[in-house]
């Protein structure tokens, strides 16, 4: 930029030729300053974009216990764990407990006979109604899982309501057993990105299933056995869905455990099947360990 006072003083003492040179140099300098300002602005914008991109990338990772890094984001979508990639012939059997307890003790007795431990996902209402059953499940060595307080469609709730649904039953189970649950299964298998992220932010691994026994349809014991044992998805790392309180589940359980054993599978709780750290997911919700 050329200041008028400077120009007047120079014009009085300097020949026209030099005056034109001076003005030209001043214009070049001013132009350089303008370009530099634009570049600085451009670099600032790029820097902000880079930071935002980095934050977005970090957003696709979740930290468990503030120590390890895991990825639950696949193609921009947050996924719960449907199954696990493993070379070991292990599967997890899970029971959802939301209504009734007529068959709870029978299920526990059959599991004990087979020396098998499983995972029970319990609603807050079920915990309140059957506290002795919760204690019996825990004392028998089974996983205690969170199935929400009121069995609502979690994707339709606000973040605050999601947290209340999780933490209300969390505190009830903790008070009864001392256990801080870490496994969460959304009611009806209903989830979206917000449900998965909310669960993780509250210290939970969101869990689905890849083998549905369809015991809730009440088709009979043979139907349950055929559905599970001949399911196309059944394999190493599968998570099997059953229900406490379904009409034929307890009747089918003994034969189901025998059938899984005959296929060479060891039944374990979900907590012993999933990876707690250093893993990522594929598009099917399969949990895959990171390469070492």
Task: Pin down the residues of each PLM region.
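Active-site beta-loop-alpha junctions enriched in small/polar residues
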Residues: 98, 123-125, 149, 189, ...
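Alpha-helical scaffold elements lining the catalytic groove of polysaccharide deacetylases
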Residues: 101-103, 152-180, 190-236, 248-252
């Amino acid at each position: 930029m050329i200041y008028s006072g400077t120009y007047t003083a120079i014009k009085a003492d300097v020949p026209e030729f030099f005056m034109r040179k001076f003005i030209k140099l001043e214009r070049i300098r001013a132009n350089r300053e303008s370009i530099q300002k634009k570049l600085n602005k451009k670099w600032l914008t790029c820097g902000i974009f880079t930071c935002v991109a980095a934050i977005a990338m970090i957003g696709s990772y979740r930290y468990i216990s503030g120590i390890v890094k895991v990825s639950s984001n696949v193609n921009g979508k947050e996924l719960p764990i449907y199954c696990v990639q493993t070379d070991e012939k292990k599967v997890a059997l899970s029971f959802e407990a939301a209504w009734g307890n007529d068959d709870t003790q029978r299920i526990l007795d059959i599991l004990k006979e087979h020396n098998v431990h499983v995972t029970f996902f319990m609603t807050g209402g079920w915990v309140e109604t059957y506290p002795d059953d919760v204690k019996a499940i825990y004392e028998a060595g089974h996983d205690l899982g969170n199935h929400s307080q009121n069995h609502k469609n979690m994707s339709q709730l606000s973040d605050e309501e999601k947290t209340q649904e999780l933490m209300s039953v969390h505190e009830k189970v903790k008070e009864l057993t001392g256990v801080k649950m870490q496994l969460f299964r959304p009611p009806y298998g209903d989830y979206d990105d917000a449900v998965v992220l909310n669960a993780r932010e509250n210290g939970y691994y969101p869990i689905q299933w890849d083998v549905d026994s369809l015991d809730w349809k009440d088709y009979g014991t043979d139907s349950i056995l055929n559905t599970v044992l001949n399911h196309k998805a059944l394999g190493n790392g599968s998570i099997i869905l059953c229900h406490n309180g379904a009409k034929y589940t307890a009747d089918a359980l003994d034969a189901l455990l025998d059938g899984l054993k005959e296929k060479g599978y060891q039944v374990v709780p979900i907590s012993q099947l999933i990876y707690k750290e250093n893993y990522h997911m594929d598009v099917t919700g399969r949990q895959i360990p990171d390469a070492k």
